Structures are given as C-alpha cells and as structure tokens.
A protein has these predicted regions:
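Mid/C-terminal beta-alpha module of Rossmann-like enzyme folds, strongest
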Residues: 10-11, 19, 162-257
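NAD(P)H-binding glycine-rich loop region in Rossmannoid oxidoreductase-like domains
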Residues: 25-86, 96-102
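Short-chain dehydrogenase/reductase
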Residues: 6, 69-73, 103-111, 154-162, ...
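SDR active-site strand-loop-helix element
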Residues: 6, 30, 57-58, 91-96, ...
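Conserved beta-loop-beta element that borders a ligand/cofactor-binding pocket
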Residues: 87, 95, 100, 112-135, ...
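A conserved pocket-lining segment of Rossmann-fold NAD(P)-dependent short-chain dehydrogenase/reductase
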Residues: 125, 138-159, 163
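N-terminal Rossmann NAD(P)H-binding glycine-rich loop of SDR-like oxidoreductase domains
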Residues: 1-24
Length: 257
C-alpha cells in the first residue's frame, strides 16, 4: 500500500514510516522539505494522488488553546480535503486518551481534530494513546528553570511511541473502523516520578517541583483523567525499560567523549 504520513519527520511519524516499511508498504512523508505545507495546504492535494491511506501523526508543541486549535483545524481540513479529492480510502489519526475530560489548551486542539475527522467525507480510524515515554523529556525541556523543573500533577500510563506507531500501521491495514481501542502502557506513574527517573537516567541533577493546574482540568489530570476507563490495548514496554535504554545511551555517549 502507498501510505502518506503527515508529520512523518516527528517522533511518532518517523516510527510510523519505519513500521509501514517493515510491513512492506510504501510510505511517503508529507513535509515542507517535500514541498508540502500542511498548515497552508500547499502541495497536499498533489502529494496524496495515488495514495491508498493517510496516517496523521502531526503535532504542535504548545500549551495554549488558540494555536493548538488553529493548527489541528487547518492541518485536518487540508488533509481531509486533499484525501477526499484524491480518492484516498482511509485516514488514520492519533489522539490522546482523556481528550474528552480534560479542558486544556492542547487537548482542545486534539478534540477539534477528532470532531473534523468524524464529520469528514473520508472513511476513518481514530487511535487514542496515552502519553509516550518520551514525554518526560519534553516536560524537562519545557518546564526547566535552571536547577528546577516544574512538573504538572498528572497520573499517566505511558506507552512506548514505537508501539503506538506499530498499532497505527496495523490499523491502516485493518480498514476504517471509527474509534479503535485505545493503547496504553503497563505502568501507572505520576509525571513527577517519570521526570525524576528521566533526570537520573540522563545524569541531570535538578529539583522537581510539582504543581496542579487549576479547577476541574487539574483535578482530572491528577486523578486519572488521562488513564483509559474502558478496554484498551496494552503495550509491553515499561517506562523503567525505556529509562534503562536512556541510561545506557548516556553512558555510551560519556565513554565516547
């Protein structure tokens, strides 16, 4: 199958491309470097001609509602419009477990993405995933203030990004099914503990300070709103195993220096 991967240069998208290739598919990456601008729509229609399916793994790094909603709305509209015009038979999109219960900026963008997908003209499948293991590093990068890392109170059930990518690739072949079973990892952990583990594994000495978002949003994040409350697909890789890999990489890098 010829499968277009939107966001194919990002963390998840690269893994989706790899998974599709291993399954014998022909993935093509939709990216500015290939003359495709998903936010403006330039080049999207032409890039989708001849494609059997599209995987939407696009992402934006923001915690604010307006840029998140604007990004996911524009990208989703352009992808769905291009896919419909090109006769693409299936669009597979990834979202987040808990997107319905957390009224938080980024989540509102993903919620809008889901709404457009469900009301579009192209047959679709939606996979909701919990936070990826790599999210701990993103929190450190975004919440670091010198020797301190500010971490929101979040109860998570993190999953390996590679396992989510493999699931997306399989869903392409399964055909449109609407909302698929969500995927989550095997451990339930607080985000503060995840960040502390990440800091230890990467050899960083920094203090973790937790805070709670106000209102119902903060309560939902802290008390299980990001955990599946329905049957789900269980990932195999633990967060501890992910940290062990990071520690080995850090030691190897240190020995090379």
């Amino acid at each position: 199958m010829k499968v277009a991967v939107a966001g194919g240069t990002g963390l998840l998208g690269r893994l989706v491309v790899q998974a599709l290739s291993e399954m014998g598919d022909q993935p093509i990456v939709l990216a500015r470097s290939q003359g495709v601008d998903l936010t403006s729509g330039a080049g999207v229609a032409a890039a989708l001609v001849g494609c059997d399916a599209v995987v939407d793994a696009t992402n934006i790094i923001t915690v604010r509602r307006r840029p998140a909603v604007r990004f996911f709305e524009s990208v989703t509209r352009h992808l769905l419009g291009g896919a419909h015009g090109a006769g693409v038979a299936h669009v597979v999109t990834v979202s987040i477990v808990g997107v319905d219960s957390v009224d938080y900026g980024y989540f509102l963008g993903k919620r809008r993405q889901e709404q457009l997908l469900a009301t579009g003209l192209v047959p679709w499948t939606l996979l909701r995933a919990t936070q990826f293991h790599e999210f701990a590093g993103e929190v450190v990068a975004r919440g670091g203030l010198g020797p301190i890392v500010a971490v929101p109170e979040m109860l998570c059930q993190p999953v390996a990004a590679a396992e989510a990518a493999g699931c997306l690739a399989r869903l392409v072949h399964d055909g449109p099914q609407g909302v698929a079973l969500p995927i989550a990892g095997p451990q339930r952990l607080g985000m503060a503990d995840m960040v502390r583990g990440y800091l230890r594994a990467t050899g960083q000495r920094r203090n973790v300070v937790s805070f709670r978002f106000p209102g119902r949003t903060g309560a939902a994040m802290a008390t299980g709103g990001l955990i599946p409350d329905e049957p789900f697909q269980l990932g195999e890789t633990t967060f501890d195993a992910y940290l062990s890999g990071l520690a080995v990489d850090a030691q190897t890098a240190g020995s090379v220096r």
